[in-house]
């Protein structure tokens, strides 16, 4: 049994190298897996399931082809694609999961998430996240004409770039106390997440138990894949062609 995890691809028409790497992964690696989990930020920005641009259709077709081959695909919303919803899933066969989801891997309970909720020291971001995740606000936003939403998102992108330059690295990383709190609350000893773009495996002791936190990498300069097979977790790099 092989299960794959990816996150933070930030797919965009402006980065055909990432797109090519993603398509190669879907057609030559994911096709041989039993399950594929996408833990958020698949897209650089997703402004609504009604955006059927040629690029979005291209990506959706890759998932549709994969699920039709019998590979189960799951998606957790990230901070860039939290508006990806039921229509996308219906069109592709992908199953949308809760922000915090516990899965069973050979009898072990494993918590999976995007990871942005763990960065509680970034107070401004958490306040922004709370606002944009309000159901009524998303309902209103999704009913704004598509071309206006595109302008709004472009403005938001520019502001995000400006703010990132002023934030310290520690603020943009997870808060260890929050990691431990969430893992204890969910009753797990293993956590898999993305968001921080810092692929690594961290082990620590909490309440006399050994805990493991696996961080997925981004796809900015190369692909990053976590493979689970025969109870072994392996982080792999995938070079751009």
Curated annotation (Swiss-Prot):
Domain of life: Bacteria
Residues holding Mn(2+) 2: 41, 79, 114, 195
Main localization, broad class: membrane
Membrane topology: Peripheral membrane protein
Gene3D superfamilies, sorted: 3.60.21.10
Family to which this protein belongs: Belongs to the LpxH family.
Official protein name in the record: UDP-2,3-diacylglucosamine hydrolase
Gene that encodes it: lpxH
């Amino acid at each position: 049994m092989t299960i794959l995890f990816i996150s933070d691809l930030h797919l965009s028409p402006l980065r055909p190298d990432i797109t090519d790497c993603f398509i190669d992964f879907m057609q030559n690696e994911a096709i041989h897996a039993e399950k594929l989990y996408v833990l958020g930020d698949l897209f650089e920005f997703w402004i609504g399931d009604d955006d059927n641009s040629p690029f979005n259709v291209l990506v959706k077709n890759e998932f549709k082809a994969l699920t039709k081959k019998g590979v189960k695909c799951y998606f957790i919303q990230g901070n860039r694609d939290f508006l990806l919803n039921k229509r996308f899933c219906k069109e592709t066969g992908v199953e949308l999961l809760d922000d915090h989801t516990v899965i069973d891997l050979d009898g072990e309970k494993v918590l999976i998430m995007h990871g942005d909720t763990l960065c509680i020291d970034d107070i401004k971001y958490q306040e922004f996240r709370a606002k944009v995740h309000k159901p009524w606000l998303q309902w209103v936003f999704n009913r704004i004409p598509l071309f206006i939403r595109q302008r709004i998102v472009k403005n938001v992108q520019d502001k995000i770039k400006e703010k990132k330059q002023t934030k310290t690295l520690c603020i943009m990383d997870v808060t260890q106390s929050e990691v431990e709190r969430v893992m204890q609350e969910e009753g797990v000893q293993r956590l898999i997440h993305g968001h921080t773009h810092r692929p690594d495996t961290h082990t620590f002791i909490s309440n006399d138990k050994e805990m493991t936190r696996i961080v997925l990498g981004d796809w900015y300069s190369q692909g990053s894949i976590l493979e689970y097979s025969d109870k072994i977790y392996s982080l792999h790099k995938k070079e751009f062609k």
